[in-house]
A protein has these predicted regions:
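Alpha-helical scaffolding within the catalytic cores
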Residues: 81-82, 223-229, 256-261
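Secreted/periplasmic serine-hydrolase-like ester/acetyl group-modifying domain
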Residues: 100, 113-228, 232-236, 319
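N-terminal secretory targeting modules
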Residues: 1-37, 89, 319
């Protein structure tokens, strides 16, 4: 109750929730690695909740162990820090899915939302006192966080774990989903009645809404970060795929041609998959649980398109 961000006391799966997803994801990795020896990773923001890593496992070499590195508002800099940590400790980095959100992945967090996106000092090498001061500032500004922690504590008898304690998948039961066909569509059903009404009113039923303008967001400094990631991949012989994620097309822009060319120049055109401009996905509101988050049916479709008709990540022809 006195630790709403789960950063003061030693890490434990007890009352594990989504208060600070970056910190909890990375600490779960540190705690689990000696037992599970991960070698395959998904790096993503909250949009990664639409990816089921147990389905991805079907395309990985036998014996692979996968982990979802997820952070709210994840940036390419945050992904680079996690990849650098794995490289520093000489852990295997055999297979990677790197999800890129436009424009979020190339943004710089601002103070009002910094508590949700601030990086684990174990990975960022930032002084821990700075990390805790940011959380304290946020706590003072938002007393609702304390009340939220109290409510979660009262409901957690016995203690519950929201996320899969091994893979860190969005839901603990993700591995038990039927993977033989896409989940049922209409992810909007998960929205509350008011939120759904507002979304339908502002976007779906609005005849005057226009597609947002796409703007280039990858500058020289971000390109250097991308090249550093590629260098780590080359040292490890990593088999990787870069996925530009979809969002609801009448709210979020697709990637520009210039930015897409930069990604392709760094990682290879054959390794970059752009779903942000796929109107068959992005203009169907039922594919999203809200304008920013695609559903499991779309994650299923993306993995199928990337691997089913091409090569799996072990270099063998997929079925």
């Amino acid at each position: 109750v006195t630790d709403p961000y789960k950063t003061l006391h030693p890490f434990s799966l007890t009352y594990f929730d989504d208060t600070n997803r970056d910190y909890l994801s990375s600490e779960l990795f540190v705690k689990n690695y000696p037992e599970y020896h991960y070698n395959s990773y998904v790096f993503c923001s909250s949009r990664g909740g639409g990816i089921n890593t147990y389905q991805w496992l079907e395309y990985l070499p036998e014996g692979s162990t996968q982990f979802l590195f997820q952070a709210w508002g994840e940036t390419i800099t945050g992904i680079d820090q996690k990849i650098s940590y794995i490289d520093e400790y000489r852990y295997p980095l055999d297979n990677v899915l790197m999800l890129i959100d436009i424009p979020l992945s190339f943004s710089r967090p601002q103070l009002p939302t910094l508590a949700m996106s601030i990086k684990n000092p174990r990975f960022s090498h930032q002084p821990r006192w700075v990390f805790q001061m940011v959380l304290l500032y946020d706590f003072i500004q938002k007393p609702s966080e304390w009340m939220r922690a109290v409510r979660k504590w009262r409901r957690s008898t016995p203690p519950t774990v929201t996320f899969d304690p091994i893979s860190n998948d969005w839901e603990k039961g993700n591995k038990e989903l039927d993977l033989s066909s896409p989940p049922e569509k209409d992810n909007m059903r998960s929205l509350s009645g008011k939120a759904r009404t507002v979304f339908l009113r502002d976007y779906v039923d609005n005849p005057y809404v226009a597609l947002p303008e796409s703007k280039s967001v990858i500058d020289g400094s971000m390109t250097r970060v991308l090249n550093h990631i590629k260098g780590v991949f080359e040292r490890h012989g990593t088999n990787y795929r870069i996925i530009v994620t979809p969002a609801y097309g009448y709210k979020y822009p697709s990637i520009t041609e210039d930015d897409l060319r930069i990604l392709q120049a760094v990682f290879g055109e054959e390794n970059v998959y752009d779903f942000s401009g796929r109107k068959d996905i992005t203009l169907d509101y039922k594919n999203f649980s809200d304008p920013n988050h695609f559903g499991l049916n779309i994650g299923w479709q993306m993995l199928e398109e990337i691997f089913h008709d091409g090569e799996s990540m072990n270099g063998q022809q997929s079925y």
